[in-house]
A protein has these predicted regions:
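Surface-exposed patches in mature extracellular/periplasmic domains of secreted proteins
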Residues: 46-49, 74, 245-249
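Post-signal peptide N-terminal segment of secreted/secretory-pathway proteins
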Residues: 64-80
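Active-site recognition of the HExxH zinc-binding catalytic motif
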Residues: 27, 243, 424-439
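N-terminal-proximal low-complexity accessory segments that begin disordered
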Residues: 2-68
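Active-site-adjacent bridging/hinge elements
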Residues: 10, 34, 395-408, 434-444
Length: 444
């Protein structure tokens, strides 16, 4: 049976399916490692939902109760609109568009939702202690239906308080100026540290009784329930790690999740970026800061991967010549590295995606993000081959190229070289783009 790449389609979204090429060739031990790491990836989902908006989890769970209730008619226009809205929430990890960050509102009415909520089993709804269904509706409906309330997840408009006008859930009752001053003081106190910490990366900044403090995301702190589940599966993964170096960095990641200590996170990043022998690798943690208007807080994400051996040969050819590209880069010499350190590049197959990486995932990744670690220890670049393959295969037959390509000769060139050129472009971007260059002294 021919593999079908296209799946469900709704709103402005087309879901794709992807293959796990080469999975059967992995050893049983490697497959177990992928399974355990995949379980650790799945348990981070609700962290991302909460980070993307204070009300996301309750809205999702409320609508899931309605969606699963067999007593409510499923063949009405309103129910179909509710289904599409819920699918969009699942896709975007909340009520904000996954790319534009603007809030999308339901195409069903408040009256309809109020009516069906009165018919479901109230014990299944995400009610707070002592809260009635009516009180829940009064709190959540304005967030869902009023376009003027919390309209954007990440706001970067000039002249606005970016923290107060962004719906992302990294700050509580805190202004932009207060947050910037809080972390500026931390960085100033740590100015002489040759291994600086990524202050604010793994915490929610709150103000209580006029005092600012961090609620750290760790096993006995905020998001503790999900993190403890992640730790459990990481501990299982320890027993089937591919080598001692991998076992060591998994142990450090567990220690980081248990303590919330950013110094441990630095040590984990250094060991992770230095391990190159395993076929199976993963990302699990609070990584990218694009979801925070101040660029400090890490959104949770997970990725489990294994090497695409054939395609990796081409990326390693690029990475082995990283110094040549650095030397010949058309930029000011002040921004060039004299010696390029540890640029590694692999083409991988994604076995499991989670959090910010799911379901709208990157096609290439370069980590770690800390500039000082990259400068001293290098970085890992990956191109995700089975995701790019799904994009390419799903796009065929749409008629787009036939309509807009200028002539038949050009069309034939695109058909022959288009996919591989796209892959080379991603390789160059991740490996040489993110892996090259240096900052001026004193610039963060």
């Amino acid at each position: 049976m021919e593999f079908v790449y296209q799946d469900d389609r709704f709103a402005d979204l087309q879901l794709l399916r992807y293959r796990l090429n080469g999975f059967d060739e992995l050893s049983l031990r490697q497959k177990k490692l992928i399974y355990y790491l995949s379980k650790a990836t799945i348990f981070g989902r609700d962290i991302t939902f909460d980070q993307y908006g204070k009300y996301n989890l309750r809205i999702r769970k409320m609508l899931e109760v309605v969606y699963c209730d067999a007593t409510i008619p499923h063949d009405t226009k309103d129910f179909r609109a509710l289904e599409i809205y819920l699918k969009r929430i699942w896709f975007s990890n909340g009520i904000y568009h996954h790319y534009g960050c603007e809030k999308f509102c339901p195409d069903f009415s408040e009256d309809y939702l109020h009516d069906v909520l009165g018919k479901v089993d109230a014990s299944k709804l995400p009610l707070k202690d002592g809260e009635s269904v009516e009180e829940m509706c009064q709190e959540l409906f304005p967030v869902m239906f009023d376009e003027t309330i919390l309209p954007k997840r990440v706001n970067k408009a000039d002249g606005k308080d970016l923290v107060r006008t962004s719906a992302c859930h990294f700050y509580e009752d805190v202004s932009q100026q207060e947050a910037e001053d809080f972390y500026a003081r931390m960085k100033q106190q740590d100015a002489g540290n040759e291994a600086p910490l990524s202050y604010g990366l793994n915490s929610t900044l709150v103000k209580e009784n006029g005092v600012l403090r961090e609620c750290v995301w760790k096993a006995d702190g905020l998001y503790g329930n999900a993190i403890r589940h992640i730790i459990y599966w990481l501990q299982k993964a320890l027993d089937v790690a591919e080598n001692e170096a991998q076992k060591s960095y998994i142990s450090l990641l567990i220690k980081y999740y248990e303590s919330g200590d950013l110094d441990v996170f630095n040590k984990y990043c250094i060991e992770w970026v230095g391990e190159h022998d395993s076929a199976v690798d993963f990302i699990n943690g609070f990584i990218e800061v694009y979801g925070d208007p101040l660029g400090l807080k890490g959104s949770w994400e997970g990725l489990v991967e294994y090497i695409d051996k054939e395609a990796t040969h081409r990326t390693q050819t690029i990475s082995k010549n990283a110094q040549w590209f650095e030397d010949h880069s058309p930029v000011d010499n002040r921004f060039k590295k004299a010696v390029v350190q540890g640029v590694s590049a692999n083409v991988i197959c994604a076995a499991m995606l989670g959090g910010e990486e799911y379901p709208s995932t990157a096609i290439g990744i370069n980590l770690p993000n800390a500039d000082w670690i990259r400068a001293r220890y290098g970085s890992k670049s990956i191109t995700i081959s089975n995701i790019t393959d799904a994009y390419n295969k799903a796009a065929k037959g749409s008629g787009f190229k036939e309509e807009f390509v200028i002539d038949e000769a050009t069309l034939q060139l695109i058909e022959k070289y288009g996919d591989i050129c796209d892959d080379r472009h991603t390789d160059l971007h991740e490996c040489l783009g993110h892996g090259s260059g240096q900052l001026l002294p004193g610039v963060d």
